[in-house]
Amino acid sequence: MRFSKTFIPTMKENPKDAVLPSHIYLVRGGFITQVASGIYNFLPIGKKVLDKIRAIVKEELDKAGCQEVSLGFVTPCELWEESGRLGKYGKELLRFKDRKENCFVLGPTHEEMMVDLVRNRVTSYKQLPLNLYQINWKFRDEARPRFGLLRGREFLMKDGYSFHADEEDMRREYDLMEKTYRNIFGRLGLRFRAVEADVGAIGGNASKEFMVLAESGEDTIAICTECEYAANVEAAKRKKTKAPAEAPEFSNFEPFYTPNLSSIDELSDFFKVHPYYFVKAVAKKALYDEGEEIVLFFLRGSDELQEVKASNAIGANEMVDVSEEELEKSGIVPGFIAPYEQKCKIVLDEDLKGAKGLICGGNKKDYHLIGADLSQFDDALFVDIAQVKEGDLCPKCGAVMKLTKGIEVGHIFQLGTRYSAAMNATFLDKDGKAKPFVMGTYGIGVSRLVAASIEQNHDERGCIWPLQIAPFEVDIIVSNIKDEEQIAFGEELYEQLKNAGVDVILDDRPERFGPKIKDFELIGFPYGIIVGKGLKEGTVQIVQRETLDKVEIPKEDVFKTILEKVQAS
């Protein structure tokens, strides 16, 4: 490919409202252009990167025995009603009606469509297992699209669905998909971790996310410093917290006057007691299909509430903040809430089970209770609702955990029979009995991977593409196209590399050398070959984009040298 004939509209200025490197460089480098909020067009080199990622994903999935299909982008609402998700998914699900008033949705995921495809077509255990996937565009009407391709409304996704006769076989496929995903992300040249995760709106029994490690990631991950344990903080566990200080001694359980003191830090200073020995109360309004209620969550003063864990503990669709006025109407005193004598639902963190000698709210303004004993709460709901923090201990090996940021690029789920049972999708087992399919589902954000790769691989000059997915592997930069010797050598080398199977572009534009090298750095081709003034002395330069190191070599060695570098990567 010749640069002079390729549509690569690079820009000098950063796009408006872009804050992340991937958003800035993908727009400036001529990879994508915005059409509307959260919707982007892929230009030639952006489409090329996308296709390379897609090819690696497809190759590994096909190798694992998966079969590719292509499902409709538009899904009838009836299928979502069958699964029970139509009313639960929220405004992110874009609904519309056709001219005949039939209701449809633009599918953000395709569980319903895939179940509908398989039911009545796969009727016997002899036809199982089956793993079908597609790589198609999806739409999710995000409330706040941002960060370019990382949180758009339209996105290219690989979604796969497996069907099994029993749980054991589903878990076998789940493990195979984890291995396959590791192969995919490894081949893409990414630093990533597979982490335990919450099942979220998809549902199921267990799930893992694949996180590209990057400081710009929206997700926080807890990672053990010694073993392989890693989890999204929404699902992360920890070993029981060790007491950080000596427990206070209280002779009685009684109220104590604490005027204008309600925060844990203020109370800790006042009582000279570590926050660990306080009971923190967090009030939330839980929303369900059938209504709403106020729920009080209690945990140690040194911990923070993990809202996803808390919501899962009570089976809520969503949790929102509750106003002081609403609390007061329910007989609850804001800032001084105790787990005692409450009429509404209470949930206590498992670390408080059996705890004694604590300080908690007094259910009365400006009062706290000292000497609280939670060992009396035998029938209360104790469950893990605390957010894992830096320095907590690994639940598997007991080593210290650290927190880091990640970008979710893949997610696998053990779905079980949630969708098949709801949609009456059954097969006949060995005994001739009808049973719902046991399912797994497996997703990869293909277009998100374009951005995630740059979040992990960039510098202040632009993109640094891994060679496997770079728009071109080698950029031949002819410094002065008016120099016949330079252009002739560049043309000859271009043909040699192209014939050898190297993905190469020849920068033959009638531009000065400065803009050409800046575009090389901005776009991020892994290798550049500078054909310049040194050619008269028989040398050219090879520059590696990652390090920007330049090596001058004899012109007769350049073909062999660059070929070895590309083939070794």
From Swiss-Prot:
One of its GO terms (cellular component) is cytosol. The keyword Acyltransferase does not apply. Pfam families: HGTP_anticodon, tRNA-synt_2b, tRNA_edit. GO terms for biological process: prolyl-tRNA aminoacylation. Its EC number is 6.1.1.15. It catalyses: tRNA(Pro) + L-proline + ATP = L-prolyl-tRNA(Pro) + AMP + diphosphate. GO terms for molecular function: aminoacyl-tRNA deacylase activity; ATP binding; proline-tRNA ligase activity. The keyword Nucleotide-binding applies. It comes from the Bacteria. Keywords: Aminoacyl-tRNA synthetase, ATP-binding, Cytoplasm, Ligase, Nucleotide-binding, Protein biosynthesis. InterPro entries: aa-tRNA-synt_IIb, aa-tRNA-synth_II, aa-tRNA-synth_II/BPL/LPL, Anticodon-bd, Anticodon-bd_dom_sf, Pro-tRNA-ligase_IIa, Pro-tRNA-synth_IIa_bac-type, Pro-tRNA-Synthase_IIa_type1. Gene3D superfamilies: Anticodon-binding domain, Bira Bifunctional Protein, Domain 2. It is found in: Cytoplasm. Homodimer. Consists of three domains: the N-terminal catalytic domain, the editing domain and the C-terminal anticodon-binding domain. NCBIfam families: PRK09194.1, proS_fam_II. Catalyzes the attachment of proline to tRNA(Pro) in a two-step reaction: proline is first activated by ATP to form Pro-AMP and then transferred to the acceptor end of tRNA(Pro). As ProRS can inadvertently accommodate and process non-cognate amino acids such as alanine and cysteine, to avoid such errors it has two additional distinct editing activities against alanine. One activity is designated as 'pretransfer' editing and involves the tRNA(Pro)-independent hydrolysis of activated Ala-AMP. Belongs to the class-II aminoacyl-tRNA synthetase family. ProS type 1 subfamily. This is Proline--tRNA ligase. It comes from Nitratiruptor sp. (strain SB155-2). The gene is proS.
